[in-house]
């Protein structure tokens, strides 16, 4: 059926809701096909002379993914950063993965969505400090937003005049011959948003919204298999390509209503995924399972049954879950695979004042994807 995603469905999230025409036919129940090469990427790793007593390096990486659906096939920036590396400290300045994305532990699926909407997915301009202590890493990131932003764009974060902050702690241990690995990590993030500066009634406003997010990951790798697990809980996870966002806060104040100067309340989301893969050099089998739940808000929402009160992804969805097996074949620099995806979104016809969705009807979709990679 038709799906919610970006880049002509290449970055797939979940199936579209049922939409009946005048004859009660679901117009979204339509099988589709596509063929794209927009994930073609180019990367340059740069190494230069020492500076400030540190080793210097940098990365520039782009792809033909475009920045919007309208610019698909256009070249866009993925990573662009410089790094200063001392004995136990790194300083990274530029655009790279958000602090909630653990490069050491994410689903090894074929699809470009990397497990969304169950897995945080965002790249941000940032300043990042990495402190290493034996098997531990402590990472502090202060970030802005670019391609992965709030509902309506990055203005909400920029208007707050404060960067998004993320603190991450991880433990990674290998055995002597590095055939076994244990990785455990956790992160906590905080951001302030000012979604607008003027109301629809042309009154200045500076109402803000605070949002927190937390995540945990675990990975165990042995010679034959790799097992990974992740859990996320957060407010306004829209910029992480997950369910969530924020809504207008309910009020009975007549002046606030007359001016349209509403406050905001974040929507809460919990998500988890489990990924398993074999580690063969020529053939690998993997299985991903994911679940996400819309928990609504802790405060009453203005006109809570109206879509206009929400600035969120999946505001009328109670849950999403996915089961996705994959078969991967490897030969030299070539990798190809077939991946199945069964995703169910629970759309509700009733919503209470806290944005909690009920009277849910599951809507499912089956997706089959073939991928071909050539690495050079």
Where are these regions (language model features)?
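Outer-membrane beta-barrel "beta-signal"
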Residues: 362-376
């Amino acid at each position: 059926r038709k799906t919610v995603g970006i880049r002509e469905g290449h970055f797939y999230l979940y199936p579209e809701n049922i939409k009946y025409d005048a004859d009660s036919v679901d117009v979204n129940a339509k099988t589709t096909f596509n063929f794209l090469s927009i994930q073609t990427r180019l990367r340059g790793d740069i190494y230069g002379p020492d500076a400030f007593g540190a080793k210097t390096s940098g990365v520039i990486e782009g792809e033909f993914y475009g920045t919007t659906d309208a610019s698909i096939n256009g070249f866009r920036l993925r990573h662009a950063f410089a790094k200063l590396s001392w004995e136990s400290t790194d300083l990274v300045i530029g655009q790279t993965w958000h602090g909630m994305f653990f490069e050491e532990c994410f689903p090894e699926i074929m699809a470009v969505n990397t497990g969304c909407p169950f897995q945080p997915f965002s790249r941000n301009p940032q300043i990042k400090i990495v402190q290493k202590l034996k098997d531990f890493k402590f990472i502090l990131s202060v970030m802005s937003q670019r391609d992965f932003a709030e509902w309506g764009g990055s203005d909400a974060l920029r208007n707050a005049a404060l960067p998004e902050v993320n603190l991450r702690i991880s433990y990674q241990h290998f055995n002597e011959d590095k055939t076994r690995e244990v990785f455990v990590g956790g992160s906590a993030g905080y951001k302030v948003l000012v979604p607008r500066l003027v109301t629809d009634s042309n009154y200045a406003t500076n109402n803000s919204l605070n949002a927190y997010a937390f995540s945990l990951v675990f990975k165990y790798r042995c010679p034959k298999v790799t097992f990974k697990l992740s859990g996320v809980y957060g407010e306004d996870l829209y910029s992480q390509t997950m369910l969530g966002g924020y809504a207008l806060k309910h009020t009975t104040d007549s002046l606030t209503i007359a001016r349209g100067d509403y406050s905001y309340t974040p929507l809460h989301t919990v998500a988890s995924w489990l990924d398993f893969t074999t580690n063969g050099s020529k053939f690998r089998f993997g299985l991903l399972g994911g679940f996400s739940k819309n928990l609504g808000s802790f405060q009453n929402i203005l006109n809570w049954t109206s879509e206009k009160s929400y600035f969120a992804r999946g505001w009328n969805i109670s849950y999403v879950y996915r089961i996705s097996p994959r078969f991967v074949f490897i030969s030299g620099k070539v990798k190809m695979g077939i991946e199945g995806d069964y995703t169910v979104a629970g759309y509700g016809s009733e919503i209470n004042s806290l944005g909690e969705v009920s009277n849910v009807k599951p809507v499912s979709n089956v997706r089959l994807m073939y991928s071909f990679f050539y690495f050079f």
